[in-house]
């Protein structure tokens, strides 16, 4: 009979919060209309990163070598690196949210009529935000991985 592994959810919460935000971002991308999608994605990304930073602050004095069956070691250095990643990610989200520097659609060539039509229709693609959150969660896990 198999036994379930014991996980330190409170110690893994900063990573899990960012992962959950990425999944919610994918759902927003799938089900929200394009007129409201950008504002929701930016707000969601910033909110998720701030919530994760708050959880990191809560666990700043804790440590564990068995947070995920020995594969994750939570210590002060890992928490510091995770906080650094989150703070830099907050700045990066604001840079990504500036849509003037990105093409409206990935398939449109810069300066082409397709790009002009996409800019006039304000049909910007926003899947970068959930992809970015998935990448941030991976970076956060990388800093505390011990296996």
Question: Across the structure, where does each feature detected by a protein language model lie?
Answer:
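Alpha-helical transmembrane segments of multi-pass membrane proteins predominantly involved
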Residues: 1-147
């Amino acid at each position: 009979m198999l036994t379930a592994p014991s996980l330190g959810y409170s110690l893994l919460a900063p990573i899990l919060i960012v992962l959950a935000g990425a999944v919610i971002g994918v759902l927003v991308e799938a089900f929200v209309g394009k007129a409201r999608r950008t504002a929701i994605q930016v707000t969601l990304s910033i909110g998720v990163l701030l919530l994760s930073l708050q959880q990191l602050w809560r666990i700043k004095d804790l440590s564990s070598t068995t947070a995920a069956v020995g594969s994750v070691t939570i210590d002060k250095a890992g928490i510091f690196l995770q906080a650094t990643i989150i703070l830099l990610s907050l700045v990066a989200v604001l840079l990504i949210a500036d849509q003037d520097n990105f093409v409206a659609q990935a398939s449109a060539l810069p300066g082409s009529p397709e790009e002009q039509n996409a800019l006039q229709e304000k049909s910007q693609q926003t899947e970068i935000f959930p992809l970015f959150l998935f990448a941030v969660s991976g970076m956060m896990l990388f800093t505390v991985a011990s296996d």
